[in-house]
Amino acid sequence: MPLFLVLKATLSENVTKVSIENTNESRAEFAFDLQCTSCRELHDSKVIINTFEEYAMPASKGTASFLMKCKFCSKELSVNLCAFEDEYLTDQSDDKWAKIKDVRKKHGLSKVKEDSFIPLSLDCRGCELIKFYPDTITFEVSLSSGKVMSCQLEDNEWYDYDDNLGEEVTMTDFSSSIIKGK
């Protein structure tokens, strides 16, 4: 059963779209706490995973974004990250929202509120990702003035100023959760 990373934040009214900067030239490095599902031991440091790197899985034809062996029980652990939603739109009347709702429903995510963004699906084998750290991610924020800004969260918040409209731009009360889908 796949897991999904769900992000939520309070945005200022002049924000129209938020996405994660994740290209081959500028790869998003997602940081998580990882726990082995066999021995339940928590890995002693954050693991950093991106969607572009692939590693051949031992004794398998598949690949994964991240591989490691649990240092406590020696079990093979793997995580495969896949992009799920490209962007979060603040205007729920946009035609794209109907498609987003359909895709969420197909994956058992219809109860995820519209004020949330689901950037990743997580296929974890032998482990669980239990906490996400947003400080390694660069977000791209589109504003009603047409301006696009890049930001990184500090203490789960970001504040800036849109010179075009003379308004403050904010992303506050950032939270994340990892939920099960189907």
UniProtKB/Swiss-Prot annotation:
Pfam families: CXXC_Zn-b_euk. The keyword Metal-binding applies. One of its GO terms (cellular component) is cytoplasm. Zn(2+) binds at residues 36, 39, 70, 73. Keywords: Metal-binding, Zinc. GO terms for molecular function: zinc ion binding. InterPro entries: CXXC_Zn-binding_euk. Requires a bound zinc ion for normal folding and solubility. Present with 3970 molecules/cell in log phase SD medium. Belongs to the UPF0587 family. This is UPF0587 protein YCR090C. It comes from Saccharomyces cerevisiae (strain ATCC 204508 / S288c) (Baker's yeast). The lineage of its organism: Eukaryota, Fungi, Dikarya, Ascomycota, Saccharomycotina.
